[in-house]
C-alpha cells in the first residue's frame, strides 16, 4: 500500500478490513476505505469504525448493518457486484447451442462450486429420472474425478447428461437452464438473480449461506432444499409448471442488480474526485 499510494481502498472481504484497522487507528491510513459486503445479510465481522462507506446488497442488509451500529449515512444500497457479462443477454437458443443442448426441452443445471463438492452424481441421477426428462448439466469445477465418472455414465452416453469441468461460461449456462441447483454463496446467487434463473439452494453451509438462502426464499427467487429428494421435488414442480417458474423469474428480476459493479466504481470515483477538488 505504501508503494502503490492508492487514492482509495475497496475491500470485498472482511480480513483486509481487519488488517487495516491498526493503521487507521494510528492515523496512518489517509485515504478513504470502502467495504463491499458480498452476502445478502450483514455479519458483525464486517463492522469496523474506520470504514468510510459500506456498499450492500439490499435495503434489508442496510437495515441490519444500521442495527449493528453503522450510521445510515455510511451505507449505500448497490447490490452485489459480479462480472458485467452476466448483465448481457445471450439468448436462450444461442446459449443452448453453445453447449449442444436441446433447443426446446427442459434443462437443469447443477453447480457445486469451483471444487465440485457435494453429492453431485446422486443429484444428477435424481434429476435425470424425473418425468419431464430434463437434460442435466453438471459443472464439476476442478473435480476431474467427478467429471470423468459422470462422462462414463449411461446418461452421458445417451445425451441426457453433460459434465463440464471448470468453466468461465456460467453466464451462458444460467441463461440456457430452466433451473439451477447450487450452493448459496453471495456471488453465485447474484449471478442467478441477474439471469433470472430459478434457484434451488442445496444444503447451504450453516451461517452466512443459510442466511443468504433465507433472504432469497423470502423474496420468492429460490427454494432451500435440505436433501437430494427435496431438490428433485422442487425441480419437478418448476419444470411441470411454467407459470410458477415464471413467477420465480420475475421475483429474481426484482432482487437483481446487474449494474452493481459499475455503480460502486462510479460512486468511489466520484468520491475521489470530490476529495481532490476540495483539496482534502
Q: Residue locations for each model-derived region?
A:
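A short, well-ordered alpha-helix in the C-terminal region of glycosyltransferases
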Residues: 244-258
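A nucleotide-sugar donor-handling region in carbohydrate enzymes
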Residues: 52-114, 142, 146-148
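Acidic donor-binding loop of glycosyltransferase active sites
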Residues: 175-185
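A short alpha->beta transition loop at the rim of the catalytic pocket in nucleotide-sugar-dependent
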Residues: 177-178, 196-198
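C-terminal "capping" alpha-helix adjacent to the active site of nucleotide-linked donor transferases
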Residues: 218-219, 227-244
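C-terminal alpha-helical cap of glycosyltransferases
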Residues: 257-280
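Donor-nucleotide binding loops and adjacent catalytic segments primarily
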Residues: 92-97, 101-176, 210
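Active-site and donor-binding regions of nucleotide-sugar-utilizing enzymes
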Residues: 1-69, 74-77, 83
Amino acid at each position: 500500500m505504501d508503494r502503490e499510494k492508492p487514492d482509495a481502498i475497496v475491500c470485498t472481504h472482511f480480513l483486509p478490513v481487519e488488517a487495516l484497522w491498526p493503521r487507521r487507528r494510528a492515523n496512518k491510513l489517509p485515504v478513504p476505505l470502502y467495504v463491499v459486503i458480498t452476502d445478502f445479510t450483514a455479519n458483525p465481522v464486517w463492522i469496523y469504525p474506520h470504514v468510510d462507506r459500506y456498499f450492500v446488497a439490499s435495503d434489508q442488509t442496510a437495515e441490519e448493518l444500521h442495527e449493528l451500529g453503522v450510521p445510515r449515512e455510511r451505507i449505500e444500497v448497490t447490490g452485489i457486484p459480479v462480472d458485467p457479462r452476466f448483465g448481457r443477454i445471450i439468448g436462450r437458443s444461442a446459449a443452448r447451442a453453445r453447449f449442444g443442448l436441446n433447443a426446446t426441452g427442459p434443462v437443469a443445471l447443477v453447480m457445486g462450486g469451483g471444487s465440485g463438492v457435494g453429492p453431485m452424481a446422486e443429484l444428477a441421477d435424481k434429476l435425470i429420472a424425473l418425468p419431464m426428462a430434463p437434460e442435466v448439466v453438471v459443472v464439476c469445477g476442478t473435480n476431474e474425478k467427478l467429471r470423468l465418472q459422470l462422462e462414463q455414465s449411461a446418461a452421458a452416453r445417451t445425451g441426457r447428461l453433460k459434465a463440464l469441468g471448470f468453466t468461465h461460461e456460467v453466464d451462458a449456462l444460467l441463461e440456457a437452464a430452466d433451473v439451477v441447483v447450487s450452493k448459496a454463496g453471495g456471488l453465485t446467487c447474484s449471478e442467478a438473480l441477474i439471469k433470472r434463473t430459478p434457484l434451488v439452494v442445496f444444503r447451504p453451509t450453516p451461517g452466512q449461506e443459510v442466511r443468504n438462502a433465507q433472504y432469497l426464499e423470502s423474496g420468492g427467487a429460490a427454494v432451500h432444499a435440505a436433501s437430494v429428494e427435496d431438490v428433485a421435488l422442487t425441480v419437478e414442480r418448476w419444470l411441470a409448471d411454467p407459470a410458477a417458474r415464471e413467477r420465480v423469474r420475475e421475483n429474481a428480476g426484482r432482487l437483481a442488480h446487474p449494474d452493481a459493479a459499475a455503480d460502486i466504481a462510479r460512486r468511489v470515483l466520484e468520491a475521489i474526485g470530490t476529495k481532490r477538488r476540495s483539496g482534502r
